[in-house]
From Swiss-Prot:
Protein name: ATP phosphoribosyltransferase
Family: Belongs to the ATP phosphoribosyltransferase family. Short subfamily.
Subunit-level organization: Heteromultimer composed of HisG and HisZ subunits.
Record-annotated membrane-spanning stretches: none
Pfam families, per database record: HisG
Catalytic activity: 1-(5-phospho-beta-D-ribosyl)-ATP + diphosphate = 5-phospho-alpha-D-ribose 1-diphosphate + ATP
Length: 218
């Protein structure tokens, strides 16, 4: 049976809506009383796994799920061995460098060498600062990253930004955008090559039905 890994959190509702448009219904995951992490759709065509967003590519890479929906930010951070098929056009956000608004810096290039940068996206932050040839100390934080500069533990942060409201409320401003992120459709490479569970059909249908979402978002 086809298995689809779905991300908990902000992408879940749109992911389920998209899958419903191709005949796969996992809306039971949206029921506030639901405690199941694995369910079958009513047609018994596929099963869904409800997992943390960071774990979606892990389940797909190891073949426990043939399909997955996950943010581009997760793919950039984890660099999993999966096949990427489509930009699904929802879940828009951006990975940015931010500093306190009273900071003298107005570009990441202006940050002092060996300064401290807090982030839960350690690899993305490291790659960015390596690219601009600025040595920094990356401090891994997995809660409220904004507290890094507020408490003086770091001069800057690298984090996902959607509306910018959280940054503003905490006295931070964006300096640079590393990349834009949206939801992506991924697949297990071998399953795709073998067309297991009619995988090519589902990839084509999901990709095709995502186009109206992408057009609406733009």
């Amino acid at each position: 049976m086809l298995t689809v890994a779905l991300p908990k959190g902000a992408l879940l509702k749109d992911s389920i809506r998209l899958l419903q448009s191709v005949g796969l219904d996992f809306s039971a995951f949206l029921d506030s009383g639901n405690r199941q992490l694995q369910i079958q759709d009513p047609t018994q065509t596929a099963q869904g796994l409800l997992v943390r967003a960071q774990d979606v590519p892990v389940y797909v890479e190891y073949g426990q799920a043939q399909l997955g929906i996950v943010g581009f930010d997760v793919l950039q951070e984890k660099k999993p061995q999966v096949a990427q098929f489509a930009d699904l056009g929802f879940g828009h956000c951006r990975m940015s460098v931010a500093v306190p608004s009273q900071s003298p810096y107005r570009s990441a290039m202006e940050l002092p060498p060996n300064c401290r940068v807090a982030s839960k996206f350690v690899h993305c932050a490291h790659d960015f600062f390596s690219k601009i040839d600025l040595p920094v100390e990356i401090i891994p934080l997995y809660g409220s990253v904004e507290l890094g500069p507020i408490t003086g533990m770091s001069e800057a942060i690298v984090d996902l930004v959607s509306t910018g409201r959280t940054l503003k409320e905490n006295g931070l401003i964006e300096l640079d955008c590393l990349y834009d992120s949206t939801a992506r459709l991924i697949a297990h490479p071998l399953s795709y090559r073998l067309n297991q569970y009619n995988l090519e059909h589902w990839l084509n249908e999901i990709s095709k039905n995502s186009q109206p979402l992408a057009a609406k978002a733009s």
